[in-house]
Amino acid sequence: MKHIIPVLLIALLAACSPKKETAESPEKPFARSVWNKEQANQWYQDKPWYAGANFNPSTAINQLETWQADSFNPEVIDRELAWAEGIGMNLMRVYLHHLAWEQDPEGFKKRMDQYLSIADQHGVSTMFVFFDDCWNNTYAAGVQPDPKVGTHNSGWVQDPGQLIYDSPEKMMDLEAYVKDVLKHFADDKRILLWDLYNEPGNSGYGDRSMPLLKNVFQWGREVNPSQPLSAGVWNFKLTKLNKFQLENSDVITYHNYQDSATHAQMIDSLQQYGKPLLCTEYMARTRNSTFEAIMPMLKENKIAAINWGLVAGKSNTIYAWDTPIESGEEPEVWFHDIFRQDGSVYSQEEIDLIKELTSAD
């Protein structure tokens, strides 16, 4: 997702240093406390190094087209996750949407279970994402729009987006959604982690996203699933949001689309928390965030490496954020993604590197 990471991480260091309990520290309202360093590292110590992608099927323009009953496509999911398995990937980050659940809660969970069964057959664990502040702020159920030619993520939708500001009473419905899904899958070993909120504060929301961010962590603690809860930091100008995210995440997740030097600075800053790190978004070729530059560094530090995009398709994420190509021709340098829809690859050199790092045959 589009965002800005400053070169200097002063804001993070100043506002988000590991929390020290003081007499003034208010008691957290959560049903269980955040994992401490020992708990987090105990969870991670026997885990493999994870490498994977943010995954939505190439035939889906957004989360709704992925999960609605009429467009859910297990055949495409199976085929594309087989390609991921073939290059040694073992983790996918997958976005949900409350509107797909709202239409059909039981059917939605059955489709989630079907996806998980397919992923598990390919040796792939899953990280699900609940809320998202990126791209289009309104949406509707039913048939989704066609992609805009040559335009990055033209149909991706926020969740809940503008709805929560127009109808604050929807907070209760969002609580029901989150708790229903978490309770149903609370002990599902196919799920590695719950990513509660993607890039809170994006799209100009800033601190307006704080109430939902606080609520979704509270709802998660009240359900108390066996999997860790997290929300990734992505823009260190959002100091209040960052502070809350880092203090309330069981393990630390983050996004970085910058070059290796800037990414290394971010790693150094986040390692002070002493918890496992998972990079849940990276790899934007034209911004020097490439597999060659970043993936070996992540493996060396046992940081999960989850790039944006597996198969080029309706999301149009081969095109850069702010550089549409009106003709729709394929850019010389893809921004995101690895495979074409026929299974051919953008770069065999990248595939060779990924397979070397993941020890895939």
Where in this protein do the model-derived segments appear?
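C-terminal motif of bacterial Sec signal peptides marking the signal peptidase cleavage site
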Residues: 12-15
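Structured C-terminal subdomain patch of bacterial secreted/periplasmic proteins
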Residues: 323-324
